[in-house]
Amino acid sequence: MSRGELEAGLEAGIAALGLDLTAGQRGQLLDYLELIQKWNRVYNLTAVRDPQEMLTQHLLDSLAVVAPLRRHTGGAPSSLLDVGSGAGLPGVVIAIACPEIRVDCVDTVAKKAAFLQQVAATLRLPNLRGLHDRVERLAGPYDVITSRAFASLADFVAWSGGALAPHGVWMAMKGRHPDDEVATLPVEVEMFHVEQLRVPNFEGERCLVWMRRRS
């Protein structure tokens, strides 16, 4: 699939999501996709190999959280931690789309953290860092902590709670509404909002689960 075809698909997806991204940001997203493809030949960053599927399942899926995230932050400078980031999803996409947000992507696998560091350098993203560490060891504080297919909600908040700012929130990307997982959240954590995400060209269910410490 040519870059031009991927660019057309990205443009259509961005329009469907109602996002306003510059030509430079769109170019960075395509460059990022190419970096994933290049590194994936040597390192197993993602099981998805087809460029069109990468566009939909990785870029557009991650872009779907940008509008809800901006609504929460109000466009103000803030900090975000992406836990179990892997190839940088959604962290790298957020760093590109939201330059006002300082994004740290943490992964326990050294080669994935090295890839994230390479992405930050190659795409010249001063607001992006790749960290090789365990989330339990990070102090933060982060205004938003996110994850995409990382762990159960209970484990996610337990492992990352030490890095959350006093008035911070967790933003978990999930498939269908995780009723069973919500029921096992610790008593000191409340789910205060769940919203359905509409990912262009993706037929499965996607939702965003927002959580915070009880006041």
Residue ranges: model-predicted function:
Residues M1-G75, K111-A114, Q118-P126:
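Class I SAM-dependent transferase core
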Residues L60-S147, V157-A158:
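Conserved SAM/SAH cofactor-binding pocket of Class I
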Residues I101, R176-S215:
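Active-site capping/gating segments
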Residues V157-V169:
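A short glycine-rich, Lys/Arg-flanked "PGG" loop and its adjoining helix->strand segment in the class I
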Residues H167-H177:
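Conserved beta-strand signature within the Rossmann-like core of class I S-adenosyl-L-methionine
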